[in-house]
Amino acid sequence: MEAVAAAEVTERKPDNDGVEPRVVHWGELSQTPIPSGPQEKETAERTPDIPNSGSSQAESPAVSAMLHAIAASHLPVCSQQQGEPDLTEPEKVAILGQLYHKKPLVFLERFRTGLREEHLACFGHLRGDHRADFYCAEVARQGTARPRTLRTRLRNRRYAALRELIQGGEYFSDEQMRFRAPLLYEQYIGQYLTQEELNARTAAPQAPRSGSPGTPAYPLSDLLFQSYQERELQQKLLQQQEEEEACFEEEEDSDEEDQRSDKDSEAWVPDSEERLILREEFTSRMHQRFLDGKDGGFDYSTVDDNPDFDNLDIVARDEEDRYFDEEEPEDVSSAELGGD
């Protein structure tokens, strides 16, 4: 009896491989491994790279396109601990595919905001379920309002980026704006600068450099680079002036009026208050130029595709309306009166 009891105790002891032999009864010698417990399964499901990333190759084209679209969006695919590395797109696609096949209704509920109308065909097998029908109808409504929603989101993100750049000060400095739009700068500001202001612009003061007392304040490399930038800017200015003159030559009827206005502008010298108004108008036009996406050297994808710019202060809404008045109430009322 003692030997049999010892044998039973031995049968209950798990080995190092994680395989726990089943409890045996009298005369039973089976040592079939038992399956993992529910906690182990839950832990495995939370692991981002459980599904093989190559399994997405077996998906239908419609399902694969849907999974990749959601993986590329800003929607979180799964919860992660702080400090964990971000999931790659193949890992996201694998996790999404696993959830779609195991729990399609949960998938639809969780990621419906990232779905488009063409993705609804992937949930045809859920038709008839009142919850699935409700979520699919919501996706269809989003598709109808999506262009306007995307346009509003785009302008809000650019406006938030504009405020950030204005606070930074560098992007909308005189030097940067002059380099981006030399002709516009010359028309509003450059032609009215005094000789002292021109000299200050040519040799802008720099912060003292550390080193020996004999170190020059303006190294040769900086002077050469500044000279190169100035030549490039002058070439750009000349090109824009030639393009503008070509446009004026096409309007032959107004040539005389243009010449008169040019003479008047040459004779007119604005005072300090008028120069301030010109500067404000120039800066406002540069702001609008940025919002319209006309700054060729700026990577707008860093703003348009960045959800971090979605949080706008409610206090700034009034100021935002100055830039984005898509419909003027006076225009609408006048159109209605004209129709009567």
UniProtKB/Swiss-Prot annotation:
Keywords: Acetylation, Coiled coil, Nucleus, Phosphoprotein. The modification N-acetylmethionine is found at M1. Residues 9-25, 39-48, 260-272 have a biased composition (Basic and acidic residues). It comes from the Eukaryota. Residues 50-59 have a biased composition (Polar residues). Residues 241-259 have a biased composition (Acidic residues). Residues 1-62, 200-220, 239-272, 289-310, 321-340 are annotated as: Disordered. Residues 229-258 form a coiled coil. It is found in: Nucleus. One of its GO terms (cellular component) is nucleus. May play a role pre-mRNA splicing through the association with the splicing factor SF3B complex which is involved in branch-site recognition. Associates with splicing factor SF3B complex, involved in branch-site recognition. This is Coiled-coil domain-containing protein 97. The gene is Ccdc97.
